[in-house]
Curated annotation (Swiss-Prot):
Gene: mscL
Protein's recorded name: Large-conductance mechanosensitive channel
Job of this protein: Channel that opens in response to stretch forces in the membrane lipid bilayer. May participate in the regulation of osmotic pressure changes within the cell.
Keyword set includes Transmembrane helix: yes
SUPFAM superfamilies: Gated mechanosensitive channel
Annotated organism of origin: Shewanella baltica (strain OS155 / ATCC BAA-1091)
InterPro entries hit by this protein: Mechanosensitive_channel_CS, MS_channel, MSC/AndL, MscL_channel
Amino acid sequence: MSLIKEFKAFASRGNVIDMAVGIIIGAAFGKIVSSFVADIIMPPIGIILGGVNFSDLSIVLQAAQGDAPSVVIAYGKFIQTIIDFTIIAFAIFMGVKAINRLKRKEEVAPKAPAAPTKDQELLSEIRDLLKAQQEK
């Protein structure tokens, strides 16, 4: 089998296509969450904390010199990224939880018939004995 045919067979399998769609949707969802956090959640939090713009929060390690930019630890952006991650992780958790719940409902097998009671067993034995006597 040629390399192109092998690749085509690999790429056309359902799992690979599903994964690719999931990655594309996940990337788009990540951008939506990042915008939601940066543009909707963080501004009110900044106002509550005294007009702080989280994206500007940083510690300057070395001031700008000439054309070289300053060296900073941008912990405000890091805080935003942590909030992004938390929201995405929670959304994925809720999605997986919903999918697992649906799978459990599908997997519920029909209950096996209950074991016969002693009375039923005795009646079955009597029936079998009567049949055996009639056949003689």
